Amino acid sequence: MKNYIVLLLLAIMAVSCGPYQTALKSTDNEVKLAMIDTLLKREKYSKAVNLFDQIIPQYRGTDKAEALSIKYAKALYETRDYPNSAYQYERFVQSHPASDNREYAAFMGAKSHYHMSAVYSKSQVNTDRALAKLQDYINLYPDGEYAEQANGLVSELRFKLDRKAYEIAKNYHHRNRYIPAIKSFENFIVQHPGSEFMDDAQFYLIDSQYLYALKSRNELVPERLELATKYYNTFVSRFPTSEYREDADEIMENINDYKIKNNI
């Protein structure tokens, strides 16, 4: 038993005094640089970051700054430290405008912001920022190496914003808050013209306006039903084969029945 404990302690000491720990404690930056390259090859990014944090300030303004900066940013990105990777990539772009890695850094900085975008149900401040950063890259490098990927990320983020806006409007509708629902769906249709939720929004706008009309004072019903009819005509013109077509037709039949019964 005692021999086992001794061996265990020796193993722990061996690990604690291994090459990485030696480099971490060393005052020789060349030792740290060599270990960083080894760790990056082995994809041990967290350990590499620890060493980078020790030496990066000492190499700013030197011939090695450019190569170290891009490696540091990549290591941060691979550890999913996206706020810091975004910062380091953007700093690289500003500090090394003539670098061959400038386009790569510009894209990866924007992609770091993309990863900070929250799910659609939460605040989309980071999504807006990521879209702006990706658009900056696309504008700067329209035929760039990463342009296709950047456009794909933009589409994903726009879909997220579309969904958030649509779900907010739909929530008003389902809670029978027809005035804000109508306003929200109208804004959605204008502000999200290419959205996959467009026929959904157009249908719920009809339904919201129709139900709002029915809850109105008698003298206001005709005018509000006319607006629902206008929304219906737009809907069937744009989406004649929509999954909501039958429901929309039923609303229109109800509107016509109401007009007949009330001599409108």
Residue ranges and their predicted role:
Residues 1-17:
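Sec-dependent bacterial lipoprotein signal peptides
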Residues 16-264:
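Acidic, polar-rich low-complexity tracts and alpha-helical solenoid repeat scaffolds
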